[in-house]
UniProtKB/Swiss-Prot annotation:
Xref: Gene3D superfamilies: Adenine-specific Methyltransferase, Domain 2, Vaccinia Virus protein VP39
Enzymatic reactions: a 2'-deoxyadenosine in DNA + S-adenosyl-L-methionine = an N(6)-methyl-2'-deoxyadenosine in DNA + S-adenosyl-L-homocysteine + H(+)
Name listed for the protein in its UniProt record: Type II methyltransferase M.FokI
PANTHER family: DNA ADENINE METHYLASE
Top-level taxon of origin: Bacteria
InterPro entries associated with the record: Ade-mod_methylase_MStsI, Ade_MeTrfase_dom_2, DNA_methylase_N6_adenine_CS, MeTrfase_D12, SAM-dependent_MTases_sf
Intervals of motif Adenine-specific methylase 1: 218-221
PROSITE patterns given in the database record: N6_MTASE
Motif (Adenine-specific methylase 2): 548-551
Length: 647
C-alpha cells in the first residue's frame, strides 16, 4: 500500500550498507519506525525481525506479515461451516445498522457529505470490522488470525478510497477506482523459523526495553504528523467510534503527536534514542530537508558510537510532488551508519530457508536487468490476479522477464523483439551460475572495471561492440549509467559510464544468482519475435497470455529508445487489441498491463476496448505519496478476460 516515506526504493541501498559494514554474525534486526513494514519484510529472510510502529493500523500489518510465520488455518471457523473466511466477508449479506461507523460518517449515507467511500464499500468495511470483532470475542479466531484478516482489509481499503494519495482529504468527484467493489486479497507469509516480535509503542520508550544486533531507524523527517494522513485507516483498525471533527472527519490525535515532527523536541528525542540503543550496528534513514541537519545527526551518532566507524551515504531523493518546489539536486536521502561498542546477541541463527505460503509477496524474484517499464514493484498485485493453474504462460513483451520468472506454469514462453535482451536471458538460462559469475568477474579484472575507471569502461565497451557476447553485455550494463540497455542506430551499445553509481555490487550479484537459480528451475523458452508473429494457434483454454507493451500515451523512452528498436504507435496498439479479442473468442485467457490515463492524457482507444473486459486498478506508486499528489498521473491497470482466478 502507498505510504509517505516508504523505503521500497531504498531496499537495495540499505542492503548494500549492511553488507559493507556488518561483517560479524548478526542475527537480530529491528525496524523501529516500521510504517507498513516493507523493510522488515525484506530482511525477514535473513534475520529474526523485531518491528514497531506507534500507529495501530501499522502494527496490525506488522503482526500479520512479520510476527506471523504461517497462513492461519482458521480451524474454529471451519467448525461452524466457514471454510473460506475471505469469501464469507466479501459476500455475506447484511443490513446497515447504527453500528456502521464508516457508513454513517465517511460515505454519502443519510445526508453525510463526506465522500471517502461509496455507501456499498463503506458498509462492507463496517460489516467486516464488526464481524472480526465478534469472531474474536467468541474465540472463533485467535490474535494472529484476527491480525491476518484485519491486515487484508487494511491493504484492500486504499484500492477503493476516493483520495489522491492519503486520507488528508477526499476528492469532490468520484474517482473510477473508488466506484469498484472492495476485494480482499490473501497475504503471503514468509516463515523464517524465528520468533519474530511486533510492538505498538512509542519508539523512545521501547528502545530501553529491546536489544539486538542491527537497528534500523527511519523516523518522520518533518512537521507532518502521519496520523492526520492515515486517520481513516487508524479508525478502521481500532474501530473505536472516536469523536471525529472537521470537514474530513479527523480523529483526535494530540496524544499521538510524534516528537520527531516537532523542531524543539526532535534533537533531544533522537539523542535519547541513540544513547539508549542496545544494538551493535545502527542505520538511520533521513532526508536533507528534514528537521535535523546532517551535522546534528553525525554529532549525535559519534557521541554514542565509535567515531571511526561512522559512514554517510547520500542518494538523490525522488521527492513526492508538492506545492513547494525545490531543485532536485538539493534533495538527498541519507543513510547513516555507526557501530556501538556492544556485544552481539547470543541467538542461534536458523539454517532453514525461508518458506513462503501461497504467492511470494515478499520474496518475488527481481530481474538483474534494469529494463524501463519492468513490473517488479507491481508483482504482488499482478501475480495474484493470474489463474492458479496455468499450462503455458506466454510473456509476450518479456523485457527483463520480471513477470515471467515469478509465474508458476508448466511451460513459459518469453518473447521480445529486442535481440540483445533475449540473448542475455537465454545465455543465463543455458549457463551455470558459477560460469556466469566467473565470466563477469574475469572481465572486471581484465578491464579494471570500477565505479571510477571510465577509461576501462570505454575500452570494454569498444570490445563488446566488436564481439557482441551476451554475458559481456550484461557485465557492461553493470557499470553503465542507470544500468540501462541503450543502442544507437548502428546497433552499437552507447550508454555512458555510470560514474560513482553503477557497479557489480554484492547486492547485484546476489540478485543475479537468485534470478539464474530460479530460471534454471523453470521450463522457459526465450524467443526473439515481434508480438504479431507469435504462433497463438498452439494455445488452448489452459494457457495465459500476459502482455506488457509500451504504453501509447506515456512519454518515457525505453532503454533502447523504442523498446526493441521499433516505435509503438496506434496501429501497433490496434493489432495487439485485435489479437487479444481473437484469443478471447478461442477461450484463451489473457492479461494486459497498461495505463488508462497518464498526466492528463487518456488512452481513448484502450478505454473503449476495455469496457467488454475486467479492469483491475493497481497502485502505481508505493513511495512518497501524499495529499499533494497530482491527480491524473498514471492510472495503471490489469485488464483480463476472466474473473475467476482458480481454473
Amino acid at each position: 500500500m502507498r505510504f509517505i516515506g516508504s523505503k521500497v526504493n531504498l531496499l537495495d541501498n540499505i542492503q548494500e550498507v549492511i553488507e559493507e559494514n556488518v561483517k560479524d554474525d548478526a542475527h537480530v534486526f529491528m525496524d523501529l519506525f516500521s510504517g507498513t513494514g516493507i523493510v522488515g519484510e525484506n530482511f525477514k529472510k535473513d534475520y529474526q525481525v523485531l518491528s514497531n510502529d506507534s500507529l495501530y493500523f501499522s502494527y496490525i500489518l506488522l503482526k500479520a506479515k512479520i510476527e506471523n510465520n504461517s497462513i492461519p488455518n482458521f480451524s474454529e471457523l471451519k467448525k461452524i461451516g466457514i471454510k473460506e473466511p475471505l469469501h464469507y466477508l466479501e459476500n455475506e449479506e447484511f443490513e446497515i445498522s447504527h453500528e456502521f461507523f464508516l457508513t454513517h460518517n465517511y460515505s454519502p449515507y443519510m445526508g453525510c457529505e463526506r465522500m471517502y467511500f461509496t455507501v456499498e464499500n463503506a458498509s462492507r468495511i463496517d460489516f467486516i470490522r464488526l464481524t472480526l470483532n465478534r469472531w474474536k470475542n467468541e474465540s472463533l479466531i485467535n490474535e494472529l488470525e484476527f491480525a491476518y484478516l484485519l491486515a487484508i482489509l487494511i491493504e484492500a481499503v486504499p484500492f477503493i478510497s476516493n483520495i489522491s494519495g492519503t486520507y488528508g482529504a477526499y476528492l469532490k468527484h468520484w474517482d473510477k477506482r473508488a466506484l469498484g467493489k472492495l476485494k480482499l486479497r490473501t497475504l503471503d507469509i514468509g516463515n523464517n523459523h524465528y520468533a519474530n516480535k511486533t510492538y505498538n509503542e512509542d519508539a523512545n520508550s521501547l528502545i530501553e526495553k529491546v536489544y539486538g544486533d542491527i537497528l534500523y531507524i527511519d523516523p518522520p523527517y518533518n512537521g507532518r504528523q502521519y496520523i492526520s494522513n492515515y486517520h481513516l485507516l487508524e479508525t478502521i483498525a481500532l474501530y473505536d467510534y472516536p469523536e471525529i471533527y472537521g470537514k474530513t472527519g479527523l480523529r483526535p490525535y494530540v496524544e499521538s503527536k510524534s516528537l520527531y515532527c516537532q523542531k524543539k523536541e526532535v534533537g533531544n528525542a533522537f539523542n535519547h534514542l541513540i544513547e539508549k540503543a542496545n544494538f551493535r550496528h545502527i542505520l538511520v534513514s533521513y532526508s536533507s530537508e528534514g528537521l535535523l541537519l546532517e551535522e546534528e545527526i553525525e554529532s549525535i551518532l559519534k557521541s554514542h558510537g565509535l567515531p571511526e566507524t561512522y559512514r554517510i551515504y547520500k542518494m538523490p531523493y525522488r521527492k513526492y510532488k508538492s506545492k513547494h518546489k525545490q531543485e532536485a539536486s538539493e534533495l538527498h536521502e541519507y543513510i547513516f551508519y555507526i557501530q556501538k561498542d556492544i556485544a552481539l546477541t547470543n541467538s542461534v541463527k536458523s539454517n532453514k530457508k525461508i518458506e513462503v505460503g501461497k504467492h511470494k509477496t515478499n520474496s518475488y524474484i527481481k530481474s538483474p536487468l534494469n529494463y524501463v517499464g519492468g513490473k517488479h514493484k507491481l508483482l504482488n498485485q499482478i501475480v495474484p490476479l493470474f489463474p492458479d493453474k496455468i499450462d503455458t504462460f506466454v510473456d509476450l513483451f518479456s523485457g527483463g522477464f520480471n513477470v515471467g520468472i515469478n509465474v508458476n506454469a508448466n511451460k513459459i514462453i518469453a518473447t521480445d523483439i529486442n535481440t540483445y535482451v533475449v540473448e542475455v536471458l537465454d545465455t543465463m538460462k543455458k549457463t551455470s551460475v558459477e560460469e556466469v559469475i566467473a565470466h563477469i568477474e574475469r572481465r572486471i579484472e581484465e578491464y579494471g572495471l570500477s565505479k571510477s575507471n571510465e577509461e576501462g569502461f570505454k575500452a570494454f565497451r569498444n570490445y563488446y561492440n566488436k564481439t557482441k557476447k551476451p554475458l559481456d553485455l550484461y557485465t557492461l550494463i553493470c557499470y553503465s549509467f542507470n544500468y540501462q540497455f541503450r543502442f544507437n542506430n548502428n546497433q552499437e551499445y552507447n550508454n555512458p559510464f555510470g560514474r560513482e553509481r553503477s557497479q557489480f555490487s554484492p547486492a547485484l550479484k546476489k540478485k543475479l544468482v537468485l534470478f539464474i537459480e530460479a530460471l534454471h528451475e523453470k521450463n522457459v523458452q526465450f524467443v526473439c519475435s515481434e508480438f504479431e508473429h507469435f504462433n497463438f494457434s498452439q494455445l488452448d483454454q489452459n494457457d495465459l497470455v500476459y502482455c506488457d507493451p509500451p504504453y501509447l500515451i506515456t512519454t518515457g523512452s525505453y532503454n533502447d529508445g523504442n523498446r526493441g528498436f521499433k516505435d509503438w504507435n496506434r496501429l501497433q496498439e490496434i493489432k495487439l487489441l485485435d489479437i487479444l479479442d481473437h484469443l478471447n473468442s478461442k477461450g484463451v485467457y489473457f492479461a494486459l498491463s497498461n495505463v488508462l490515463s497518464h498526466k492528463g492524457l487518456e488512452n481513448e482507444l484502450l478505454l473503449e476496448w476495455s469496457k467488454k473486459y475486467n479492469i483491475h486498478h493497481l497502485q502505481h506508486s508505493y513511495s512518497n505519496s501524499s495529499h499533494n499528489t497530482t491527480r491524473g498521473e498514471s492510472q495503471e491497470v490489469l485488464i483480463t478476460n476472466y474473473t475467476n482466478y482458480t481454473k
